[in-house]
Regions:
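A short N-terminal helical cap/helix-turn-helix that marks the beginning
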Residues: 3-26, 45
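Conserved AMP-binding/adenylate-forming core of the ANL superfamily
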Residues: 21, 25-72, 76, 80, ...
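Acyl-group handling in specialized metabolite and lipid biosynthesis
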Residues: 1-3, 35-36
């Protein structure tokens, strides 16, 4: 039985140790007739890589990182990577307008902002109004000039 005081990130690491080659996550994109899956070990490795990226950027315990993405495997990798650093993940609702994103981000005072390509227009409109954000990380094929590619950062 799991202790009631185990961090959720430790559950992921434990599953990677116990079931390294078992499928952890499956993502289906019916419109593209695409199916992706990753094992527990792959999931844990990618979470570690993203956590290390954030740490290298200066993110530390109790910092805040805004997380604005559509549901996907990358959403989970980013979320777990954020919390593995000890920082607070600040997930925002995908339905938020630019004004709502700016308001919530201003209240949170994040140091980093992770978003998927579906939100480029909304982030473009507010990014200059977020003085605490030092790094923007974009997920997907379209990466604006002011952001770094999530995928490329994971490759390093």
């Amino acid at each position: 039985m799991t202790s009631p005081h185990v961090h959720i990130g430790e559950i992921l690491a434990r599953n990677a140790r116990l079931y390294p080659d078992s499928v952890a996550l499956v993502e289906r994109t019916p419109a593209e007739k695409k199916r992706s899956e990753i094992t527990w070990k792959q999931f844990d490795d990618q979470v570690n890589r993203f956590a290390n990226v954030l740490i290298h950027k200066g993110i530390k315990k109790e910092d805040k990182v805004v997380h604005l993405m559509m549901n996907s495997i990358d959403w989970l990798i980013a979320y777990f990577g954020i919390i593995r650093t000890g920082a607070w993940a600040v997930p925002l609702n995908f339905r938020f307008t630019g004004t709502e994103i700016e308001y919530c981000s201003s209240v949170a005072e994040p140091k980093c902002f992770v978003f998927s390509q579906e939100f480029i227009d909304r982030v473009d409109g507010i990014r200059n109004d977020l003085p605490t954000v030092k790094d923007f990380i974009a997920v997907g094929r379209e990466i604006p000039k002011y952001a770094e590619s999530f995928e490329k950062l994971l490759e390093k």
